[in-house]
């Protein structure tokens, strides 16, 4: 395996434990106990995924996540000891792809790393020129919104939208099922491939981030509409 995983956690015992489990799976690991050194690594090396703790000595993990997202699209998993929803929502809104609360099972974290990497690799493979023949079924156009599954690119009024693999898959699924109301449960299962939990706000926060990138009016979105108590739809 050539994938490089960044670990940033000021709790050395946790960082060391995660490092051991990931190395046992064949991953290369770059481990740091503060944000400054981690950011320097991000700019120097080609990374495949980052695992960021929320509480760091020199910068909170959410700020670190936002700084990484300014120039990089690789998956980010947040670690937090606080279970308040605001932590999870803030992390995902700033660009994280997943989160896991402490204490956690290292095997679960490893499984999530593999899941995120698989999606990211598929995303990059599909985005390579010539990786797939153009097929009308792989392209959807709705009122100035153009989305291509073969190139994994989105355009709104001819301006390209910078979206993560998760955001792309959410938008594609909603466009593909245009006119239908898709529940959070169905959307989560289709995009993440996991069982949905009632307390899970992941779908909501990714929808909010997509709307923000599409410059949608919060109260009257043009594209992704909420059907309260039911789900989301693109008409």
Where are the regions that the model predicts?
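Short, Lys/Arg-enriched segments at the junction into DNA-binding effector domains
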Residues: 4, 115-168, 172-179, 185
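Active-site beta3 strand of CheY-like receiver
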Residues: 46-51, 56
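Basic, amphipathic DNA-recognition helix from helix-turn-helix-like DNA-binding domains
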Residues: 66, 70, 75-141
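Charged docking surfaces used in two-component/phosphorelay signaling
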Residues: 16-24
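His-Asp phosphorelay/catalytic-motif detector in bacterial-type signaling
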Residues: 2, 46-48, 71-76, 197
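Short hydrophobic/Thr-rich beta-strand motif most characteristic of the beta2 strand and flanking loop
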Residues: 26-34, 41
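Positively charged, aromatic-enriched patches within helix-turn-helix-type DNA-binding elements
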Residues: 153-222, 227-230
């Amino acid at each position: 395996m050539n994938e490089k995983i960044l670990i940033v956690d000021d709790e050395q015992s946790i960082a060391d434990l995660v490092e051991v489990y990931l190395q046992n799976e064949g991953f290369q690991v770059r481990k740091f106990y503060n944000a400054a050194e981690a950011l320097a690594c991000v700019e120097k090396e080609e990374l495949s995924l980052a695992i960021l703790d929320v509480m760091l000595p020199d910068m909170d993990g959410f700020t670190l996540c936002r700084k990484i997202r300014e120039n990089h699209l690789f998956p980010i998993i947040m670690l937090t000891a606080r279970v308040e929803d605001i932590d999870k929502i803030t992390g995902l809104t700033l660009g994280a792809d997943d989160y896991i609360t402490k204490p956690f099972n290292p095997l679960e974290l490893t499984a999530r790393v593999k899941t995120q990497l698989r999606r990211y690799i598929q995303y990059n493979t599909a985005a390579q020129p010539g990786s797939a023949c153009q097929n009308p079924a792989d392209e959807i156009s709705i009122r100035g919104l153009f989305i291509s599954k073969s190139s994994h690119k989105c355009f709104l009024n001819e301006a390209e939208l910078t979206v993560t693999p998760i955001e792309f898959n959410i938008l594609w699924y909603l466009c593909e099922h245009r006119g239908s109301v898709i529940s959070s449960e169905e959307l989560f299962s289709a995009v993440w491939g996991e069982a949905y939990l009632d307390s899970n706000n992941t779908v909501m926060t990714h929808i909010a981030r997509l709307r923000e990138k599409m410059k949608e009016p919060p109260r009257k979105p043009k594209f992704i509409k909420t059907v309260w108590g039911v789900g989301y739809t693109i008409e």
